[in-house]
């Protein structure tokens, strides 16, 4: 960390951005999170100077949490225009009753909006304006919360979240706020002051306003010391991640979204919790507390069947089927047919599925006039049908002429549906086919794809040969896949 008096503010800011810029391919767009405050104003101004305003895209998120939010949006648009940078903004609704606090909810909403805007401009790099004072606040806040190694590592200079396309970079992380203030003064910059930054009801503000100023006279180097703590924690976390990666290779199936319970319980509790944390992060799931991870390990050790495992986390549910452990969406509306499968999955006298149509209709049928679509997104089902071009001889290839012959419909299971999995074979119930393939009951709540009134495709089973018998047809061919959102992301 460079003391504010050692070099000119402009030099240290330009040097910091120059290092970040050297890591990027020439002429790639640089997205900059621009709130209009001091820090992001300095970042945008300096980036426009050294990278060229044409490469910079100022992205503003309107949270609607302040009565001044509209004025801030207008200020940011005007400033970006004056610098010659492109500008975009997004309005978000921050859930106040999400259970994670208004600060965390606003942060999550902001990052989602920023990544959406980055995708709009093809930007793979997002510059954030956090500095050394922010890092000190973060480390201290994590210490007071009793965070583990990952929390103490605080903010990384460069980071790409799991399943994300955008790399987050913090080129100012080793600079002090005082240096940014001097830069802003030297260039007569104008910025906005968010009145909420002085509200000490928020934990971070309380540290900034009341605690850190009291530390400075007695521990003048506390920012450097806390930054070193973050660096040590980050190094330790990398070692834990390396260990977890080794364990994941040993415990996971060929599909890394599925773990072997028997292999998992061979690990000790600490190693098991470390693996779960790493696995969840690799899948893009929100992190869990140490207590929550310990409960997951405990239940996985004790569970002997699917009914004994009761773990819900952030809208997802940890499931056990035979020896397979995996996460499934936990808040979707399950069809009655899938519920019946759970009740008597392996009973010798398993009856045909029967269901109340009104229950299955919780997820309404969707229709598509297919005209060469490659992806049909179904938000209510948390997934998409994908139609990939293939050769006619490939397995489960379907002629495009059939797909466009009538409207495609995606419907919930009603119970009792039958299909043929090979030409000339007998019609069999979906339930029996699912069981034969070892598909867990909760994974059977999938949309069935119809062409007109004929069942064409069932996820995890394949094409219904009663509808398409494999005969030659003119034109192109497609393979149909069902991809849950966690695979698309």
UniProtKB/Swiss-Prot annotation:
Its EC number(s): 6.3.4.19
Keywords: ATP-binding, Cytoplasm, Ligase, Nucleotide-binding, tRNA processing
Any single biological process term in GO: tRNA modification
InterPro entries assigned to the protein according to its UniProt record, in alphabetical order: Lysidine-tRNA-synth_C, Rossmann-like_a/b/a_fold, TilS/TtcA_N, tRNA_Ile_lys_synt, tRNA_Ile_lys_synt_N, tRNA_Ile_lys_synt_subst-bd
GO molecular function annotation: ATP binding; tRNA(Ile)-lysidine synthase activity
Pfam families in alphabetical order: ATP_bind_3, TilS, TilS_C
Function according to Swiss-Prot or TrEMBL: Ligates lysine onto the cytidine present at position 34 of the AUA codon-specific tRNA(Ile) that contains the anticodon CAU, in an ATP-dependent manner. Cytidine is converted to lysidine, thus changing the amino acid specificity of the tRNA from methionine to isoleucine.
NCBIfam families per the UniProt record, alphabetical: lysidine_TilS_C (TIGR02433), lysidine_TilS_N (TIGR02432)
Domain free text: The N-terminal region contains the highly conserved SGGXDS motif, predicted to be a P-loop motif involved in ATP binding.
Listed name of the protein: tRNA(Ile)-lysidine synthase
Organism from which the protein derives: Burkholderia mallei (strain ATCC 23344)
